[in-house]
Regions:
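Core catalytic lobe of class I
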Residues: 1-309, 313-318
């Protein structure tokens, strides 16, 4: 499937009239830093102004950004608000209860190496990426990272003639019709995760670990997909100022960060929106993965639009 896209030179809210419902919205707005961002070249105008009269002015603007973007989500859609922890906390507290109730999680991304010059507080080296869904039923694909030796040693502690294995739940978390039955002398309080024919099949293949307290499904080390990725991301490195990590935009995010968000939260035929396109990382990640059928990225800076257009025509560069 070829991903189609639009690069729109306009204000962030121009998507309101496009009639689309998006499966994924990624918000990476100004962070209320009270700074003006440009590239190192003093002649460059690629960047943005992040100066505000007050925090109240900024929060009023950001609340409008979030609620307007949230309204564009499809029923199974999710929105990621990338900011610092303070601002995302303020934002969550100001959102309507109907939206707050669909808060999914907060991802902490380790965006910086440890600081050696801290004096009066803990080093601030993580960004906050808040995930909120449109409804309780939203699209999500579990992603896996590489297994490290320590995790493998601590998790796959059981062993049989096939090999080392870990224990995964086979009993239910809540009662469901058709899953409440007795098997092998066991009738779990909340039933099973599988129907009886599946439980019988698993047991016939010796894939059930019958423990003293309750049964578990065996997950063998050699069959493991990896370690499920949680909400602390320390394996995606920030873009440095070296030649192999060329920075095209002051607050440019690594493409691997958007790869992960898109792969986990957008179906293959979905639509992605980035109202603050900047360097075009969301666009490039979408084109690289070919997951969404359509992606729209917006920016009000003509040089950012030019940059995104050039990069989208050239493809993914090595410094990403």
């Amino acid at each position: 499937m070829n991903t189609t896209f639009d690069i729109v030179h306009s204000e962030w809210d121009s998507f309101k009239t496009d009639g689309n419902k998006y499966n994924l919205v990624y918000l990476d707005p100004p962070f209320y830093t009270q700074k003006t961002y440009t590239m190192d070249d003093k002649k460059s105008v690629i960047g943005f102004d992040d100066n505000w009269n007050s925090i109240d002015e900024y929060m009023k603007w950001l609340l409008n950004v979030f609620e307007t973007s949230f309204a564009s989500l499809s029923p199974d859609g999710v929105i990621y608000s990338h900011n610092n922890f303070k601002i995302n906390s303020f934002l969550l507290s100001r959102l309507p209860e109907s939206i707050r109730n669909n808060f999914v999680t907060n991802i902490s991304w380790l965006r910086s190496h440890p600081h050696n010059n801290i004096k009066n507080s803990w080093g601030n080296i993580v960004d906050s990426i808040m995930m909120i869904s449109k409804t309780k039923k939203f699209y999500f694909k579990v992603l896996y990272g590489k297994l490290d030796n320590k995790y493998s040693k601590n998790s796959f502690t059981n062993k049989d003639e096939v090999g080392n294995y870990s224990l995964t739940p086979i009993t239910g978390e809540k009662s469901r019709m058709g899953y409440d039955f007795e098997y092998n002398g066991v009738r779990p309080k909340f039933g099973w995760r599988y129907k009886k024919d599946k439980v019988v099949e698993l047991n016939g293949k010796n894939l059930i670990h019958w423990g003293k307290n309750k049964p578990y499904k065996k997950l063998y080390l050699h069959e493991s997909k990896g370690r499920p990725i949680q909400n602390f991301w320390n394996d995606i490195h920030p873009i440095t100022r070296t030649e192999l990590n060329k920075r095209n935009y002051p607050t440019q995010k690594p493409i691997k960060l958007l790869d992960r968000i898109i792969e986990s939260s957008c179906p293959v035929d979905g639509k992605v929106l980035d109202p603050f396109g900047g360097s075009g990382t969301t666009l490039l990640a979408s084109l690289e993965n070919q997951i969404p059928s359509y992606v729209k990225t917006i920016d009000n800076n003509s040089d950012a639009i030019k940059l995104m257009t050039e990069l989208s025509s050239k493809g993914i560069q090595k410094y990403f």
